[in-house]
């Protein structure tokens, strides 16, 4: 299992109350493959740095989860098929190194 961080930009016309339940439906791919969802953090509506699909705002969501690489690829594929999702990015956060001084 590897730790991942997913950032999703969702169409601002979507009701913010439906964002988390909708994402949980997609995150079932991770849990069905034996992974865990650690945190879903809805940042809310924010201005984007540049227009994405002719929209200058988006609803930002950050999800921390642990999964196998195959389940992560399938999650990314399914999210990109949804028309209300403007952009996705999945990264593996770097482990912090503890140094003794």
Curated annotation (Swiss-Prot):
A GO term for molecular function: small ribosomal subunit rRNA binding
TM stretches of this protein: none
GO annotation, cellular component aspect: cytoplasm; ribonucleoprotein complex; ribosome
Any one biological process term the GO annotation gives: translation
Top-level taxon of origin: Bacteria
Keyword RNA-binding (UniProt): yes
This protein's UniProt keywords: Ribonucleoprotein, Ribosomal protein, RNA-binding, rRNA-binding
InterPro entries: Ribosomal_bS6 (IPR000529), Ribosomal_bS6_sf (IPR035980), Ribosomal_S6_plastid/chlpt (IPR020814), Transl_elong_EF1B/ribsomal_bS6 (IPR014717)
Gene3D superfamilies: 3.30.70.60
Family statement drawn from the similarity comment of this UniProt entry: Belongs to the bacterial ribosomal protein bS6 family.
Function: Binds together with bS18 to 16S ribosomal RNA.
UniProt cross-references to HAMAP family, sorted A to Z: Ribosomal_bS6
PANTHER family linked to this entry: MITOCHONDRIAL 28S RIBOSOMAL PROTEIN S6, SMALL RIBOSOMAL SUBUNIT PROTEIN BS6M
Protein name: Small ribosomal subunit protein bS6
Gene encoding the protein: rpsF
């Amino acid at each position: 299992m590897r730790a991942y961080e997913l950032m999703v930009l969702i169409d601002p016309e979507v009701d913010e109350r439906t964002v988390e339940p909708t994402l949980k439906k997609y995150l079932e791919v991770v849990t069905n493959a034996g992974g865990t969802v650690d945190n879903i953090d809805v940042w809310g509506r924010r201005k984007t740095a540049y227009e994405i699909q002719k929209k200058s705002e988006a609803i930002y969501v950050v999800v921390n989860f642990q999964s196998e690489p195959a389940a992560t690829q399938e999650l990314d594929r399914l999210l990109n098929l949804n028309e209300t999702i403007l952009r996705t990015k999945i990264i593996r956060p770097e482990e912090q190194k503890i140094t003794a001084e």
